[in-house]
Amino acid sequence: MGLLERLRKEWFIVGIILVIAAAKLEPTIGGKGGPLKPEITITYIAVSAIFFNSGLSLKTEELTNALMHVKLHLFVQLFTLVFFPTAIWVFLQVLSLTPINEWLLKGLQTVSCMPPPVSSAVILTKAVGGNEAAAIFNSAFGSFLGIVVTPLLLLLFLGSSSSVPFTSIFSQLFMTVVVPLIIGQIVRRYIKDWLERKKPPFGAISSCVLLMIIYTTFCDTFSNPNIDLDTFSLVIIVFIIFFIQLAFMLLTFLFSTSKNTGFTPADTVAIVFCSTHKSLTLGIPMLKIVFAGYEHLSLISVPLLIYHPAQILLGSVLVPTIKSWMLSRQKALKLTRQPKVPL
């Protein structure tokens, strides 16, 4: 694959780097009170646009196909929204004794509170040949669940900014997240055939709006002379993120393949990806609302910005290995179930 083709394929990750660089060069453009007026365009319009887009693109009619696999869904959601944040909280009690930047550590906690993404876990499950219907259900259901659970987890583990009261956070979440999502689902009912025929680039649209949110977030950071990020902390956080992903992928793999769980090899693939992936699309707008007024908001966002490309990179690298395991396991199970030929 040529360099240009690779850049075109990974345009979003390239975009993140470019918008952060642009914010560094001239932070006043996207900062508070700047020409872009992020306090209106981002806080209300951009966030609402992302969730309206999610409402349009979520195929809720497909969820019924996987609805009955209760044990699998229960495991994924409990692992993602209960075990993951709790385990990271315990881990951070140890890391807080190190010289790593405390706001990056808080950022790791925010990563753990995020719901599964709508796309990446499904794409990787499909690439391996795993239980795609289960992956679709858990990604979509986790996104809906995350609208309520994620802000509660963030407030539980980190608290909100002192300038924004609890009721204000949830009223804003309702107006900019829940309402646009519901409107998107209602509109989808009426134009479903057109959407299926034309297949609008929902992912690309959300990603472009997300780049705008990331840009203004970092404009605020670089406008603040009090914020200092050391290279040591950043490098260590990258290593920690890859370690967490690998450790949790291994943990979910070992559990789902143990005896008496009843999961098929295809189920295991969906479990491994859906349980360990975290949503950037839902995460950044939520952080923007819950931590409004935090001068360190962008530092808190950094681990999530790293986690997103890391999970795609790691997942893509492991696709051939996981696929090979799944096919050999399915073959072995098929052989053991075949009736023995009498002598």
Swiss-Prot record:
Membrane topology value: Multi-pass membrane protein
Transmembrane segments: 11-31, 38-58, 72-92, 117-137, 139-159, 164-184, 202-222, 235-255, 271-291, 299-319
Biological process according to GO: sodium ion transport
Topology, Cytoplasmic side: 1-10, 59-71, 138, 185-201, 256-270, 320-343
Major subcellular site: membrane
Subcellular location: Cell membrane; Endoplasmic reticulum membrane; Golgi apparatus membrane
Gene3D superfamilies: 1.20.1530.20
InterPro entries referenced in this protein's UniProt entry, alphabetically: Na+/solute_symporter_sf, Put_Na-Bile_cotransptr
Single annotated GO MF: symporter activity
Pfam entry (one): SBF_like
Function: Involved in teeth and skeletal development. Has an essential role in the biosynthesis and trafficking of glycosaminoglycans and glycoproteins to produce a proper functioning extracellular matrix. Required for extracellular matrix mineralization. Also involved in the regulation of cellular calcium homeostasis. Does not show transport activity towards bile acids or steroid sulfates.
Stated name of the protein: Sodium/bile acid cotransporter 7
Organism, scientific name: Xenopus tropicalis
Gene name linked to the record: slc10a7
